């Protein structure tokens, strides 16, 4: 597991109040991990803070799974 993947999983677990072991790449935030719309907004904000990035609303709407969050962080993180 890459450093970015580990950081994303930790943030998701903390934001959604689930065990990190439940946060697997194929899980969807709403359907599998019980997130609501406020959780999703807070999760995006936490990812922005952690990786020093700004996630536009149109991109945030597409981040719906653990893997999509990891992929976005990998692609957009600041060096």
Swiss-Prot record:
Q: What is this protein called?
A: Acyl carrier protein
Matches recorded under NCBIfam families: acyl_carrier (TIGR00517), PRK00982.1-2 (NF002148), PRK00982.1-3 (NF002149), PRK00982.1-4 (NF002150), PRK00982.1-5 (NF002151)
Q: Which family does it belong to?
A: Belongs to the acyl carrier protein (ACP) family.
Q: Which InterPro entries match?
A: ACP (IPR003231), ACP-like_sf (IPR036736), PKS_PP-bd (IPR020806), PP-bd_ACP (IPR009081), Ppantetheine_attach_site (IPR006162)
Biological source species: Verminephrobacter eiseniae (strain EF01-2)
Where found in the cell? Answer: Cytoplasm
Annotated signal sequence is none
UniProt KW keywords: Cytoplasm, Fatty acid biosynthesis, Fatty acid metabolism, Lipid biosynthesis, Lipid metabolism, Phosphopantetheine, Phosphoprotein
